[in-house]
């Protein structure tokens, strides 16, 4: 099914070209959408696109700094963020756009000789444990009827079946763990809210600070990546819950 798009125009100076907006007609009108990791390249673009859609009463962005701040590695902070969101209305769509490929000068491992316990623990804390805590505190707050979704941004390199190159031990393993956590949560969610969806999404190569040092090509702009992802989100329904999909909506091997 093709993305449902309408043209909108940014009236700000220097941004006169029309841009395409995903309408998200599969969601009930109103309620809330939220992006966790809202200040990153993809997160910021997703927040803007969700606002442009006009589908939701409010679009909230959570990040490490700002008015709606939270700490992904602190469960009390995660729980408070989820409670704050729930008090604002029905939660219809949450996108987890958090993630870490590497920190500082410590680049992704090319060999088992570079595996380090602290770096592995940090990768799992950000890429798997933090999102698991968000799932724990957000999924019980989704409406029991009507389409609602939590979508976690994963990565194709987290696919075990698609791994032909090796390397990147911490990032690959932590994203694979995220995929399993999403799948488990989706099974439990279906018992509580049969129309709800919980999925992992691969955004493709996007031109952000995270991918810049490693991408063979420049990647797509965050605005374009956001449009692709929201198009997939609009098309997915309860029968797709628990899956892992790329930016085209194609299933990615586990």
Task: List where the protein language model places each region.
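Rossmann-fold cofactor-recognition segment
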Residues: 63-80
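Conserved active-site helix of classical SDR/Rossmann-fold NAD(P)-dependent CH-OH oxidoreductases
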Residues: 48, 132, 176-187, 223-230
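Hydrophobic positions on the long internal alpha-helix
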Residues: 134-138, 142, 181-182
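A glycine-rich helix->loop->beta "capping" turn
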Residues: 84-98, 103-104
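C-terminal helical subdomain
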Residues: 196, 200, 208, 212-254
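N-terminal Rossmann NAD(P)H-binding glycine-rich loop of SDR-like oxidoreductase domains
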Residues: 36-49
């Amino acid at each position: 099914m093709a993305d449902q798009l309408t043209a909108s125009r940014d009236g700000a100076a220097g941004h006169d070209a029309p841009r395409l907006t995903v309408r998200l007609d599969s969601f009930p009108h109103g309620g809330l959408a939220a992006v966790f990791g809202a200040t990153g390249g993809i997160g910021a673009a997703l927040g803007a696109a969700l606002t442009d859609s006009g589908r939701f009463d409010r679009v909230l962005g959570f990040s490490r700094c700002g008015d709606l701040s939270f700490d992904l590695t602190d469960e009390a902070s995660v729980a408070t963020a989820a409670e704050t969101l729930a008090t604002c209305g029905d939660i219809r769509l949450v996108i987890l756009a958090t993630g870490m490929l590497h920190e500082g000068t410590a680049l992704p491992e090319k060999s088992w000789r570079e595996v380090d316990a602290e770096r592995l623990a940090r990768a799992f804390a950000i890429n798997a444990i933090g999102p698991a805590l968000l799932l724990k505190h957000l999924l019980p707050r989704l409406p029991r009827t009507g389409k609602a979704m939590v979508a976690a941004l994963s990565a194709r390199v987290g696919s075990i079946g698609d791994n032909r190159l090796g390397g990147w031990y911490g990032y690959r393993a932590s994203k694979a763990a995220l995929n399993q956590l999403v799948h488990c949560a989706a099974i439990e969610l279906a018992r509580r809210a049969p129309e709800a969806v919980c999925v992992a999404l691969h955004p493709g190569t996007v031109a952000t600070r995270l991918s810049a040092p490693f991408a063979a090509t420049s990647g797509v702009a965050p605005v374009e990546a956001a449009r692709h992802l929201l198009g997939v989100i609009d098309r997915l329904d309860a029968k797709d819950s628990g899956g892992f999909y790329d930016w085209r909506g194609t299933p990615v091997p586990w």
